[in-house]
Amino acid sequence: MSSTYARFDTVFLLSRFAGAKYSPLWPSSSSSSHSSLLSSGIHLRAKPNSRLRSVTGASSSSSGPIIAGSESIEIKSLPTKPIEGQKTGTSGLRKKVKVFMQDNYLANWIQALFNSLPLEDYKDATLVLGGDGRYFNKEASQIIIKIAAGNGVGKILVGQEGILSTPAVSAVIRKRKANGGFIMSASHNPGGPEYDWGIKFNYSSGQPAPESITDKIYGNTLSISEIKVAEIPDIDLSHVGVTKYGNFSVEVIDPISDYLELMEDVFDFDLIRGLLSRSDFGFMFDAMHAVTGAYAKPIFVDNLEAKPDSISNGVPLEDFGHGHPDPNLTYAKDLVDVMYRDDGPDFGAASDGDGDRNMVLGNKFFVTPSDSVAIIAANAQEAIPYFRAGPKGLARSMPTSGALDRVAEKLKLPFFEVPTGWKFFGNLMDAGKLSICGEESFGTGSDHIREKDGIWAVLAWLSILAHRIKDKKPGEKLVSVADVVNEYWATYGRNFFSRYDYEECESEGANKMIEYLRDIVAKSKAGENYGNYVLQFADDFSYKDPVDGSVASKQGVRFVFTDGSRIIYRLSGNGSAGATVRIYIEQFEPDVSKHDVDAQIAIKPLIDLALSVSKLKEFTGREKPTVIT
């Protein structure tokens, strides 16, 4: 195999010799390997070096102890060829884990990424690496580190054991002024040998790479011919510290500290601590055996004095405990069952695989994500120190209900309706136009980072409750989640909202359904009757970014009626198999006397209309949704 070599000089690390130990995080070449980078003649391991040194003991340096170092590293060029199926979106690349474990599949994508970036974005630069702890993350970490070194990256900051939530990656990038970061996650999709894995890249602002880069990545996967790899040993990710090879270093960092520090800056922890330490206030957080399990105890228990047993499923597992780490009423059923008991907690929440989504519940009360972001925005200035000067602007994704619109109108704030995808919020934040935003898909966040943030949303709700309860004496009735929501509805009106998900539909039928709906839209006219509803307009949503002028088209088929009701159809490709058809149904109700009606009853006529208009059963063969939110 042909190879090229590069040498980097370094100052020899003088230290007490203690021997350097490395624990391979993937099988040896004699075992079933994850990549041809392992099974070919190159095993991504440095040659024996007599000058390998180790420093033991704690260090007061923020970068931790130096674990090992070497005078030089070899960079090898490994021949490769394009692999089909690496089309990349703003959520990165998601496939079944077995696909990523195929020869060079991940390595090709990582090299294609470096081939897509300007040299100054990574040469001698610092990049962050972390993920949600799912199966294959540790092995993938080693591949990414070696290819990063091979391409001239100066430093990798990696979470201990490869753990960093998606919000934490964004926070670390911003705090440490890194040039970007890799996030190893398939978000809320299941994990394990038979399930999903994913990878995406975030820019120096902490937000996902724009389409201009993801399109280049895909283009480069179609023409790639070599992978640049540094021959260094696997990095021990189990201990905080710095490992150096030539001019390249890997710093294993505490995955909690930077994120916790940011949360302490955003929120009044003393105020929240006063709430969670009350004997008459019940709290429960379900980490779903996902990445927020690593954050829940340090934040909620150790810092905010919640009871230790208030954290459920708090140990991150590679397969999420055989669960589906999607915080909704279907997949977080254990939490829902507890919250709907007569003696259930006052407040409950759950987060997803990589920690960027959230679900909020009161006792026997579910808060829709659309209402949640609106209520946070309406209360932010008085309850959250970060917003003392007031939010700069508000925004929601197009399918999200119009609840937030009414808050923006009352508070006289700039408002934006954007396509689904957090990058659209990030552009507005970077331009100073936006503070609080959300998506109906259980994503809520603010400009403290450039990703949605599950724990942030939970702390925001706890802040709102704590602000209302702080003067309540033991024995006095506490303000409940339901009280906060009902007060909001009385002020702004209620947007009845539901989403029907039909997961893993045959892609051909799902796409034909959307094309059929686009044909209806093209022929539609205002004033047409759809049952008892009168059409105001129908379109396929398009968005022109007010910051960079870019246009996103075909973002969802909308039917908007004169009474404010909406039906929206979208396809989601974030799963690793088939397509997910999503139908969103919304109806605004200003009459307080009608706010207690069950949402599914209130919008049933619209649901029936949505199914009839789309001919969903005819196109997909599906009679019932997989998930109703």
UniProtKB/Swiss-Prot annotation:
Where are the catalytic residues?
S187 (phosphoserine intermediate)
Q: What regulation of activity is recorded for this protein? A: Inhibited by the Calvin cycle intermediates fructose-1,6-bisphosphate and ribulose-1,5-bisphosphate.
Database matches in PROSITE patterns: PGM_PMM
Q: How is the cofactor bound?
A: Binds 1 Mg(2+) ion per subunit.
Q: Which UniProt keywords apply?
A: Carbohydrate metabolism, Chloroplast, Glucose metabolism, Isomerase, Magnesium, Metal-binding, Phosphoprotein, Plastid, Transit peptide
Q: Name one Pfam family in it.
A: PGM1_C_vert_fung
EC class: isomerase
**An example Gene Ontology CC term for this record:** chloroplast
For the keyword Flavoprotein, the answer is no
Cofactor section = Mg(2+)
Q: Which InterPro entries match?
A: A-D-PHexomutase_a/b/a-I, A-D-PHexomutase_a/b/a-I/II/III, A-D-PHexomutase_a/b/a-II, A-D-PHexomutase_a/b/a-III, A-D-PHexomutase_C_sf, A-D-PHexomutase_CS, Alpha-D-phosphohexomutase_SF, PGM
Report the subcellular localization: Plastid, Chloroplast
Where do the annotations place Mg(2+) binding? S187, D352, D354, D356
User: Which residues of this UniProt protein bind alpha-D-glucose 1,6-bisphosphate?
Assistant: R94, S187, D356, R357, T420, E439, S441, K452
Broad class of the protein's primary localization:
plastid
The transit peptide spans: 1-69
- Any GO BP annotation: glucose metabolic process
Q: Does the keyword Nucleus apply?
A: no
The enzyme's E.C. designation: 5.4.2.2
Role played: Catalyzes the reversible isomerization of alpha-D-glucose 1-phosphate to alpha-D-glucose 6-phosphate. The mechanism proceeds via the intermediate compound alpha-D-glucose 1,6-bisphosphate. This enzyme participates in both the breakdown and synthesis of glucose.
Instruction: Give the similarity note.
Output: Belongs to the phosphohexose mutase family.
Assembly behavior: Monomer.
Q: What is this protein called?
A: Phosphoglucomutase, chloroplastic
